[in-house]
A protein has these predicted regions:
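Nucleic acid-binding interface residues in structured DNA/RNA-binding domains
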Residues: 2-117
């Protein structure tokens, strides 16, 4: 995807961002991964903060509520929308009231099996 630099939209999606978005697309309804889980799943390189940056820029195109902090909380300011998705998908919760918290022990998704190549 290419975009002129002055159009005011997000920057073009690079390989790392594309990989993050692919992982998020693969998270099943009712399950979650933390920013760190995604970074670890993708292997050496960028960490949780870089995953967070990708989600901040491009996350609206994917099921962003399935990517949360390691303590089970959604991105700041998104509790009320995220909890509606969690309840609709049957995501295990520790608290449906602010501060919303997902039960990471039950809801964490390990990712798709990877080729041992």
């Amino acid at each position: 995807m290419t975009r002129p630099p002055d159009d005011g939209g997000p920057p073009p999606v690079d390989d790392f961002a594309s990989s993050v978005l692919d992982v998020v697309d693969s998270i099943p309804p009712g399950r979650v991964m933390s920013y760190g889980d995604i970074a670890e799943y993708l292997g050496a390189g960028p960490g949780p903060r870089q995953v967070g940056r990708v989600m901040a820029v491009y996350g609206g195109a994917v099921a962003w509520w399935r990517v949360i902090h390691a303590d089970g909380t959604p991105a700041p300011g998104h509790d009320s929308v995220a909890v509606r998705h969690y309840l609709a998908e049957g995501t295990p919760l520790r608290s449906a009231r602010p501060p919303v918290r997902v039960d990471m022990r039950r809801a964490r998704w390990p990712g798709l099996p990877r080729d041992p190549a």
